[in-house]
Amino acid sequence: MSNSQYLYVGTYTRLAPHLEAANGSGIHLYALDLDTGALRCNSEPIVIDNPSYLSIDKIGNRLFSVSEIEQHEEGGISAYAIDPDSGALTYINSQQANGSAACYVSINDTGSTALLANYGTGNVCSYPVADNGELSVASAIHQHQGSGPNSERQEAAHAHSIVLSPDNKFAFAADLGSDQIISYQLHSDTGQLLPLAALQLQAGSGPRHLVFHPTQNFAFLISELISQVTLLSYDATSGELRVL
């Protein structure tokens, strides 16, 4: 196809407590024809356990995937090289998630650091990434604390995402279990995460995902347990978030 775009789809391959079925095969590659809208599966799936969240680096050279596994020792993060012509993935390496139910991965703009959120154990990790895309062992692991009023979903901390500020100086982890956004300073040269502050949100709200406005100092937060979008101000100098 002359005018196409490649899509990567992660699937659940193993059952987890929140799933009724898990019939997937791994990561699937599709080609989308931008002229006709036709979607075509381009290859056999890449075999990996529960690649429930995928992230591609800014220049499109690497794809990173979580393996969302409840067992602490089996979950992980994996790196793949992307063929620029075919979109095919080539496995590079994997590292342990250092927690259970890894659910979110993000990459800084230079591709030198990968950030991972573990929902089950409520912690976040950072991993240095080499020039060839190889993941090193985690350079930082931070355990969240706290709980919320929803006894079924908030019995403990549950880190649900970790995203970077537009300038990549700060990282923000939305913790569904503790009703907090935990902020960190990121040192991209070492992959270190330094805890800064915790923004306490409405009790029982269950913050899940955070995105920044592309040109303004605002962020938008989705709170899963109350189905709400919250507008936040962002101080690019200090990294502080405030509810508006």
Show which residues each predicted segment covers.
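Loop-centered beta-sheet repeat module
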Residues: 168-227
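Asp-box/WD-like beta-propeller blade repeats and closely related beta-sheet repeat scaffolds
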Residues: 88-161
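Short loop/turn segments immediately following beta-strands, especially the blade-tip
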Residues: 30-37, 80-87, 126-136, 184-192, ...
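Short glycine/acidic-enriched loop and turn motifs that connect beta-strands
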Residues: 13-17, 68-73, 120-123, 178-179, ...
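Beta-propeller fold detector
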Residues: 39-47, 89-96, 136-146, 194-199, ...
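Beta-rich, blade/repeat-based domains predominating
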Residues: 16, 49-58, 98-109, 145-168, ...
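Blade-loop segments of beta-propeller domains
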Residues: 40-111
